[in-house]
A protein has these predicted regions:
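N-terminal chloroplast transit peptides
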Residues: 1-26
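Positively charged
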Residues: 22-272
Length: 272
């Protein structure tokens, strides 16, 4: 999520070729900010019986197919990381459940915070740096030392408030593009912190919007998917530019990307 008061940084403004990363020299994020007690104020709860039953069912199905558990035990990644750009197929790929917590996950979260701050963001999901796991980091203030840094693994939305509002969002994976998206102004969340502790809390306002934007990334949903027709038509040409640039740098992946298709027909007085 691009911070609304800032523009895309130099590194965000250029496309990162598939499989490559951007090297940055940014001071490391304070590990103290990533301790599990960062979210203690929001309370803790045990994983619900339903969630455990669903996980057990998924693993049972995979054993029946002879493929073993669908969830790997650890995350393999190499730094430095960089934001991948639309339409990189990893932005649409399935994101796996995290089962291993502790130092490796903390180090990944630290690296993601570095990338996020370096690109003027206030939220970042793991698939945006090419890691298809259910992990996000965010700080609505978008500045180290201000606000609260949050690291959420395996987040789920328990409930949404009835009220909704519109906001012109920007995304680090879509340089040079903003668009209006409607979202609930309040969401109740369950997740795990970097130590694997179960947490539950409610987010409101802009913080709720940042979370929902990043949660969409974990679902393989991109923010232009939620734009109304007229708004989508306004950003269509930019989406096509990003697609063409990606294919120019990665011709072998052209058949793996999902293009936006033709521009929606313009309506006259509400009638085509």
């Amino acid at each position: 999520f691009l911070h609304p008061s800032r523009a895309w940084s130099v590194s965000s403004a250029r496309l990162v070729p598939y499989g490559r990363v951007v090297t940055r020299s940014i001071p490391p994020v304070s590990k103290a900010a990533l301790r599990s007690d960062t979210l203690k104020a929001f309370g803790r709860r045990k994983v619900s019986k339903m969630m455990m039953e669903l996980d057990a069912l998924d693993n049972e199905k995979s054993r029946e197919k002879g493929t073993g558990p669908t969830v790997p035990s650890s995350i393999d990644w190499k730094g430095p990381l960089g934001v991948i750009k639309y339409p990189d197929p990893r932005l649409r790929a399935e994101n796996k459940h995290i089962t291993e917590f502790g130092r490796p996950l903390k180090e990944l979260a630290e690296e993601m915070f570095q990338v996020m701050y370096g690109d003027n963001g206030c939220g970042l999901a793991a698939p945006q740096v090419g890691i298809n796991y259910r992990l996000m980091v965010f700080n609505p203030e978008g500045e180290r030392g201000k606000g609260m840094e949050m690291v959420l693994a395996n987040p789920t939305i328990v409930s949404e408030g009835k009220d909704k509002d519109w906001f012109r969002e920007g995304c680090l994976s879509f340089p040079g593009m903003r668009g209006k998206v409607e979202r609930p102004t309040e969401v109740k969340i369950e997740a795990q912190d970097v130590e694997g502790n179960n947490i539950e809390f409610t987010l409101k306002g802009f913080t709720a919007r940042v979370f929902q934007h990043e949660f969409d990334h974990l679902q393989g949903t991109l923010f232009h998917d939620r734009m109304p027709e007229e708004e989508f038509a306004a950003v269509h040409s930019r989406l096509v530019e990003l697609e063409d640039d990606f294919v120019a740098h990665n011709p072998s992946l052209e058949d793996q990307i999902r293009r936006v298709g033709p521009k929606p027909a313009r309506k006259l007085f509400g009638i085509l």
